[in-house]
Amino acid sequence: MESLASLYKNHIATLQERTRDALARFKLDALLIHSGELFNVFLDDHPYPFKVNPQFKAWVPVTQVPNCWLLVDGVNKPKLWFYLPVDYWHNVEPLPNSFWTEDVEVIALPKADGIGSLLPAARGNIGYIGPVPERALQLGIEASNINPKGVIDYLHYYRSFKTEYELACMREAQKMAVNGHRAAEEAFRSGMSEFDINIAYLTATGHRDTDVPYSNIVALNEHAAVLHYTKLDHQAPEEMRSFLLDAGAEYNGYAADLTRTWSAKSDNDYAQLVKDVNDEQLALIATMKAGVSYVDYHIQFHQRIAKLLRKHQIITDMSEEAMVENDLTGPFMPHGIGHPLGLQVHDVAGFMQDDSGTHLAAPARYPYLRCTRILQPGMVLTIEPGIYFIESLLAPWREGQFSKHFNWQKIEALKPFGGIRIEDNVVIHENNVENMTRDLKLA
């Protein structure tokens, strides 16, 4: 494999080209990209955990340092002012010296408010991208050039197409997350609580709970019916029935986002349903290719859900086509088939049809779908189907013409297991689809 340094060099060349095009289109001279700042909790002197501006970490793998600035014009070497205070209260990151620093001019910034004297004097044609608009105004940036929508839409659109450097980072994030999932399954099998399973996961991935790309979903039994369950019970349940883990990792600012579901016993209907969802997920991925709308794959999986509802006699005396047509599959899979993935877990531009930001909304029947793009080489997406037993979604179906088709006794028997979700991260290539997750043998 090419070294990360050579991949990064090509990555920077790609970002420079995109920057040149964006600046020419919107008649700007340069972009000033701010890593961000620490913000204190209300009425406190303690800051929230720092989360870097994703447009900043697209350029440099600096994810933990506030008050940094990048100046890019698409022609000259990117200039990074790296915050390096004299501070005996807090840890100070040293000036970077790594695989990427040859391609960026790195300058120490000893005082956060010292950036103003270091920037070009003429700033009327510089665009600011960052989370603190008032800081940009203080620096003399024109209000109309603060987070200009056209520029951001343009950059977001092309972020969908990952460079080889980005894919290399995402494969490393996969490795970390896979290690975590294996450790978490072992913790589940040994009878640990959600809280302790989460600690096992973080230990295996080398993350703190503030460093993972999203809050880990560690859900035992009926908690698996809560799509974004993040409570973490300290006490293990008396009976272990099921375990849903939706947890990722981050490498150089790039995310992995994986989900697995396990049954405590291998000889019940729930365990067979887990296996069947897994098989259907893999079967769907095997059909994926460039040139097809992501929406089509979402709709296709509802047809696969119907097949499983029929096989397991959860819905009876109704054709699979009628189930989908009348949305009887809807309460069982109330989320999209997945989403774009990259610098952010729910990565940007899922609805953008072109680099002008043309928006194509999700279908009215599936408003929670996060992507309506035509799949193209370089895109990275999650494929994460599920089947859940959520009373608030099932309740409206307990009355009316379709109620008789629901096997309510079977549903009640499955509700204590919560639900099932299986999630892999895939890369669209010209002639194939790479499953980064399964390539690491995560069952």
Swiss-Prot record:
Cofactor note: Binds 2 manganese ions per subunit.
Sequence positions that bind Mn(2+) 2: D246, D257, E423
UniProt signal peptide: none
GO biological process, one term: proteolysis
Disulfide feature: none
GO molecular function per UniProt: aminopeptidase activity; metal ion binding; metalloexopeptidase activity; phosphoric triester hydrolase activity; proline dipeptidase activity
Gene Ontology CC terms, in alphabetical order: cytosol
Reactions this protein catalyses: Xaa-L-Pro dipeptide + H2O = an L-alpha-amino acid + L-proline
Enzyme class: hydrolase
Keywords associated with the record: Dipeptidase, Hydrolase, Manganese, Metal-binding, Metalloprotease, Protease
SUPFAM superfamilies registered for this protein in UniProt: Creatinase/aminopeptidase (SSF55920)
Cofactor(s) required, per the database record: Mn(2+)
Residues annotated as binding Mn(2+) 1: D257, H339, E384, E423
Top-level lineage group: Bacteria
Xref: Pfam families: PepQ_N (PF21216), Peptidase_M24 (PF00557)
EC number assigned by the record: 3.4.13.9
Known function: Splits dipeptides with a prolyl residue in the C-terminal position.
Entry's family note: Belongs to the peptidase M24B family. Bacterial-type prolidase subfamily.
PANTHER family reported for this sequence: XAA-PRO AMINOPEPTIDASE 3, XAA-PRO DIPEPTIDASE
Entry protein name: Xaa-Pro dipeptidase
The organism of origin for this protein: Escherichia coli O81 (strain ED1a)
Lineage, opening ranks: Bacteria, Pseudomonadati, Pseudomonadota, Gammaproteobacteria, Enterobacterales
Name of the encoding gene: pepQ
